């Protein structure tokens, strides 16, 4: 931990949020038990990662209760402090959010991962209406919003625990505001309070089973198939090459949302595992796909397109993999999305600095396997994170190509707002690095109802029944996780 003299020196350099860090051994705890001890209340989060579908990433992140957060809907933003609105803004929320983020000047913490605090939450799909290059084409009709969630919700994470799964250590981080009296001493006291919480045992919320329910499509199979046929008409007319329609399912779910996270991380470990408690609703997800990642001046997108179910035996698994890589439709769709990714990254990267570093490799998850590619670029001077978001949002894998025309068609055929689905969840650090996953394989739990939405990429030779089945396959992991909870994880 830095001394008071070092703290004062950093304040003199113009930093208005200074981290105090304490390192402890926590090898007898898991990220879940630490979340239960330190967080487990509204406006907290747990973020984990599984690399290559097989091993947990080195770091896990637990956000302690956030006193400040932003909610945006349409052209309005509310800033909350301890549950009360303390600031409001009318207009495009994106410049305001960037300016809000930039209010905080912090020194970097050596020897820790790139994320050590900042904005954490989501940008829902309807964020698209705030980008000028989309706004003049999209109608933004007043669609039903049955989930009732904000378009954007971001928490200001100033107290967090970073777990090093390799060393078994935990880094407790508390940011102090040097403009406040006795801020250094109060931050040290807060760290001691957190240490006290760590020493206490936590009540384990056992999952003993509940009423078993089924997921029901709110769109319906036949209406969805009719939309696939309509999209194919647009494709044959030359309007577009691909569109990704989606359908939402819902099921009664009265269990603890954290139990769903437990089941999902076991059943479908993915590069982005996340649990957000937003008070009146929860987001629980296991996304395989980056929307965009910024690390200093590098930017990365990682399109995923092409899906097969996992085999029941190694031989069947290999056969499904070979079948996927030899499927001309799947390959054509994937190549189109690589090109779209190159175009998106190219808009914000230096000339000649865009490259495909992985091309059409297979990544395997619990229920499905995907074709995956990696597109990287070196950012132009002066590119902001909102410029990056504007260039890459929404993902081509959730909209289609050409992107704007595909989004117009989605706007026409889908009866309700997408909400969080198809948007982005993740972190935007104080250091300006950003890591956002696409909000897929993601459940929203609100008012004892679980919502899960999934889509399918429709091209010229798509079969409506197959595309409907693809939406079922993509939702299967979350639905099965919910059913595991209802059967009882701890019986």
Swiss-Prot record:
It comes from the Bacteria. GO terms for biological process: L-tryptophan biosynthetic process. Feedback inhibited by tryptophan. InterPro entries: ADC_synthase, Anth_synth_I-like, Anth_synth_I_N, Anth_synth_I_PabB, Chorismate_C. It is an enzyme of class 4 (lyase). Binds 1 Mg(2+) ion per subunit. Transmembrane segments: none annotated. It catalyses: chorismate + L-glutamine = anthranilate + pyruvate + L-glutamate + H(+). Belongs to the anthranilate synthase component I family. Part of a heterotetrameric complex that catalyzes the two-step biosynthesis of anthranilate, an intermediate in the biosynthesis of L-tryptophan. In the first step, the glutamine-binding beta subunit (TrpG) of anthranilate synthase (AS) provides the glutamine amidotransferase activity which generates ammonia as a substrate that, along with chorismate, is used in the second step, catalyzed by the large alpha subunit of AS (TrpE) to produce anthranilate. In the absence of TrpG, TrpE can synthesize anthranilate directly from chorismate and high concentrations of ammonia. This is Anthranilate synthase component 1. It comes from Neisseria gonorrhoeae (strain ATCC 700825 / FA 1090).
